[in-house]
C-alpha cells in the first residue's frame, strides 16, 4: 500500500481541509493508498499580534509547508488558495484545484441582523484591508478594528462583546459548521471576495508524476478557470492577499467566464471596479488585462498610497 503525507497548518480549519482531501484520496484509491497529516507551524500562525497586512513577506501561511515538500518530508500540501503567493518556489506547482466552496464573506453578530442594522459607530472586526475598504464604502460610519486569530478565537471575541460584528469567509464557517446568533452573507456583486477565496489548492513537486496521475480526479476545471482568472488579476496588480484588492470570476457557460475586479483605498472613498469576459484557455491573460484596465483607471495611484501609508507591504 502506498503511503502519502499531507503537510498542513494546525488550525481547526486547515485540519478540516486536509482531512477532507485525505478522505477523498483514500475513498478514490480504496485499499491502495493511506494518508497521514504532518502539521507545520507557519510564520502567519506564530505572529498573531500584528495585522496581517503589516507582517509583510510572501507566503505567510505556506512557506514552511513548501519547504517540507521540497525536502521530501511531505508529499503534498493542502492550502487555502487565497493564501498561495503568485509565484511558487522552483520545482513546485498547483497540481489540483478541487471544486470551490462559496467564495463570499459573512457578517456575524450577536445583536444585529445585518450590515444595514448596525448602529452608527459600530465596532466591526476583520483582519483584511479588502473587507475594511468595502465595509467603509457601504458604511463610512463604522469603526473597523483589526482582528487576528483562528476561527474559534474570532468568534469568542465576538461573543464576549469585544465587537458588534465581525466579518469572516463563508467557506470556513460552512466547513466547520459555525455561526452566530445573527449572520448575513455579503455576496457578490455587493461585496467582492479575495482572489481564490473558498477554493483549495493541492501543491506538490513537479517531478512527482505519480501524484499527477493519482490526484487528477481532484481537479475541477470550472474552479481552476475561475481561480486562474482571479490570480491573473492579482498578479497584474502585483498585489498580495493582504491588500485592498478583490476579484471574483463566475462561469457563464461550459468554458466561458466573467470576472469582476476591485481596488479600493483604505477608507472606501475611492473604489474602482471593472468587468471582463473570457474563456478557459485565456483565463489568466484576461485577468491580467483586467488588472491593466483598473491600473489605468486610477488603481495604481490608490495602491501606491496604501503602501506609502504603511498599512501593507509591497509583495
Swiss-Prot record:
PROSITE patterns: PORPHOBILINOGEN_DEAM (PS00533)
EC number(s) reported in the record: 2.5.1.61
Cofactor note text: Binds 1 dipyrromethane group covalently.
Pfam families: Porphobil_deam, Porphobil_deamC
Catalytic activity: 4 porphobilinogen + H2O = hydroxymethylbilane + 4 NH4(+)
Superkingdom assignment: Bacteria
GO cellular component: cytoplasm
Keyword Transferase: yes
Entry-linked InterPro entries: HemC, Porphobilin_deaminase_cofac_BS, Porphobilin_deaminase_N, Porphobilinogen_deaminase_C, Porphobilinogen_deaminase_C_sf
GO MF terms, alphabetically ordered: hydroxymethylbilane synthase activity
Enzymatic class: transferase
Pathway connected to this protein: Porphyrin-containing compound metabolism; protoporphyrin-IX biosynthesis; coproporphyrinogen-III from 5-aminolevulinate: step 2/4
Cofactor(s) for this UniProt protein: dipyrromethane
GO biological process, one term: protoporphyrinogen IX biosynthetic process
UniProt keyword list: Porphyrin biosynthesis, Transferase
Keyword Transferase among UniProt keywords: yes
Positions carrying S-(dipyrrolylmethanemethyl)cysteine: 241
Similarity comment: family membership: Belongs to the HMBS family.
Function description: Tetrapolymerization of the monopyrrole PBG into the hydroxymethylbilane pre-uroporphyrinogen in several discrete steps.
HAMAP family hit by this protein: Porphobil_deam
Extra facts: The porphobilinogen subunits are added to the dipyrromethane group.
Assembly behavior: Monomer.
Name this polypeptide is given: Porphobilinogen deaminase
Gene behind this protein: hemC
